[in-house]
Structure formats: structure tokens, C-alpha cells
Amino acid sequence: MSRQSTVEKKIEKFDPIYHNRLVNMVVNRILKHGKKSLAYRIFYQSLKKIQQKTEKNPLIVLRQAIQKLTPKLIVKSRRVSGSTYQVPIEIKKKEGKILAIRWLLESSRKRSGRNMHFKLSYEIMDAAREKGNAIRKKEEIHKMAESNKAFAHYH
């Protein structure tokens, strides 16, 4: 039996304006070089832009986008007797949400446009409508998991 104590799970904090954990998760992944106030400004401006364009609550649109981007399966490489297989693995909800946020931010950074809050707001709106590069990334991952279904027993 191990003598080490169990590690307590880290609880995500709430953001100052919306008091929402999801917002804080997104802001922490926008963050670069420790400039958190800039990350908050970018995100809040993109939420304002979403509200102007859709005339809906931006948090609901964000939640829809993240929900539609969250993958159920991912593929991981497994080495079995000299050959490498892409094995489909089910992932936890939180891990899927983190992946969805990462894909959303990557695709919004690649998007052409004036500045980050424009690109992020349009990517969130596209993801909520099941369009955009982030959705394409999710579908690609699911397709790869489906095609490698035969190797699922290696997990």
C-alpha cells in the first residue's frame, strides 16, 4: 500500500464578471506570457461581439459551441509487437472539454481577420452552428477513431 497521500482535485475558479468556470477555462487557455488581463479583455470583447451579432446570451452560445466541439473518442498510438496502432479511446468529459477549447482557440488563431476577439467570436458562432475549422477537426478525429475501431481491443 502506498504511503503517499491522495492528491486533491484542482477546482477551476470562477471569472470575475460572469462567475462561470467555463469562461475561466477559456481565458486561461487564451493566456500568453502571463498577461491575464489582456486575455480577459479579448474574451469579454468577443462575448460582446457575439451578443451583438446573435442577439442571444453569449454564454449560452459559448456553451453550445463547446458542447458541439467536445469529442467522445480520441486516438492514441499504441506499440504492439513492433508495429504502431492508432487505438480509439473514450475520454472523460472534462478532458473532452479541454480539447474542445484548445481546438477552438487554435482554429481562431489560424483564421484570417483583424484581431483576436473578432476571430474568436466568429469561430465560437461557427462552432455553435456546427461549421468552422474546429468542428472539422472534431469530425476528423471521430472519423479516424471509427476507421481504427478494429484496434480497440489493444487498449
Curated annotation (Swiss-Prot):
Keywords: Chloroplast, Plastid, Ribonucleoprotein, Ribosomal protein, RNA-binding, rRNA-binding. It comes from the Eukaryota. One of its GO terms (molecular function) is structural constituent of ribosome. GO terms for biological process: translation. Its main location: plastid. CDD domains: uS7_Chloroplast. It holds the Pfam family Ribosomal_S7. InterPro entries: Ribosomal_uS7 (IPR000235), Ribosomal_uS7_bac/org-type (IPR005717), Ribosomal_uS7_CS (IPR020606), Ribosomal_uS7_dom (IPR023798), Ribosomal_uS7_dom_sf (IPR036823). It is found in: Plastid, Chloroplast. GO terms for cellular component: chloroplast; small ribosomal subunit. One of the primary rRNA binding proteins, it binds directly to 16S rRNA where it nucleates assembly of the head domain of the 30S subunit. PANTHER family: RIBOSOMAL PROTEIN S7. Part of the 30S ribosomal subunit. NCBIfam families: rpsG_bact (TIGR01029). Belongs to the universal ribosomal protein uS7 family. This is Small ribosomal subunit protein uS7c. It comes from Cryptomeria japonica (Japanese cedar). The gene is rps7.
